[in-house]
A protein has these predicted regions:
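Catalytic-domain carbohydrate-binding cleft regions of carbohydrate-active enzymes
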Residues: 1-243, 248
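Accessory, solvent-exposed terminal regions and/or long lumenal/extracellular loops of proteins
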Residues: 242-267
Length: 267
């Protein structure tokens, strides 16, 4: 069916083996449980996949089975998990949420304008569109030069022993260091799987997240533009709409405007 077709096709596939990168495929981690433990395990899973030389990988954002949260998008505990997973998805090769019925994980079901979960997720969806030129250029490098998009720190900082042991943060492309938030800060869940806010205002519960900045170059905080020395461990406060991110000093990642769909981009 593709004979004579000059379009570059892509296919999603659950399974594969060494050499999968030879074909136009995206893989994902299968039907996983919506839980903090599962999310935390997905980070090294994606890095291991990339270390095998397969660059295009993703997860079901938020997980696939929502049994642990009553399958209710209004459950505050689920809203926090979904928000953090969507934030992480902004820095995956493919950003895609998907789940098992009767649960539906569309943004508008988690709230409305002015609600903390809705606003945070919308912020990162828009950021994804602004990052598309950077993502596209790194995807091209993956195809043409056998690179990967999710880069375990050991790939670029093998001389840095601390970096080599980190499996909870990575370089997205060559120039963006990201650290997914994989623990709850704002909610707790009772024995009936119902979530509750720890504080009435989620801004009161912003806890710090430990981030290691590899040595060998300086880094700029993605959100504040503060310049920081490499080779140090930070405790970065993370409000619900912030995920730790750092830009490698001396780089200039291309960006663009947000939009409704990638087809509307002119680059």
């Amino acid at each position: 069916a593709m004979k004579g077709n000059t379009k570059r096709s892509v296919q999603m596939t659950r399974s594969g083996a060494f050499g999968l990168q030879h074909y136009g495929t995206f893989s994902w981690s299968g039907d996983i449980l919506a839980s903090w433990q599962e999310m935390k395990q997905q980070v090294p899973s994606g890095l291991n996949y990339s270390l095998c030389g397969i660059p295009f990988w993703n997860t079901d954002l938020g997980g696939f089975f929502y049994w642990e949260f009553e399958q209710d998008p209004k459950n505050p505990a689920l809203q926090e998990l979904q928000t953090r997973w969507m934030e992480w998805g902004t820095f995956m090769p493919l950003m895609r949420n998907h789940c098992s019925s009767p649960m539906v994980s569309e943004l508008y079901l988690f709230g409305k304008e002015g609600d903390w979960a809705y606003d945070a997720m919308k912020k990162f969806i828009r950021l994804r569109y602004r990052l598309l030129p950077y993502i596209y250029s790194n995807a091209g490098a993956a195809v043409q030069h056998s690179n990967t998009l999710m880069r375990a720190l050991v790939m670029d900082y093998a001389h840095d022993r601390k970096a080599a042991t980190r499996n909870d943060e990575y370089l997205f492309g060559r120039n963006l260091l990201v650290k997914p938030v994989t623990d709850p800060m704002y909610t707790w869940k009772d024995d009936n799987k119902r979530g509750h806010l720890i504080y009435p205002d989620v801004k009161q519960a912003a806890a710090p997240v430990e981030v290691y900045l590899p040595e060998g170059n300086d880094w700029y905080d993605f959100w504040t533009n503060e310049r920081l020395n490499g080779g140090q461990t930070l405790r970065r406060p993370c409000p619900i709409d912030i995920m730790p991110g750092y830009v490698k000093a001396g780089s200039n990642p291309p960006g663009g405007t947000d939009g409704q769909e990638s087809a509307g981009k002119t680059w």
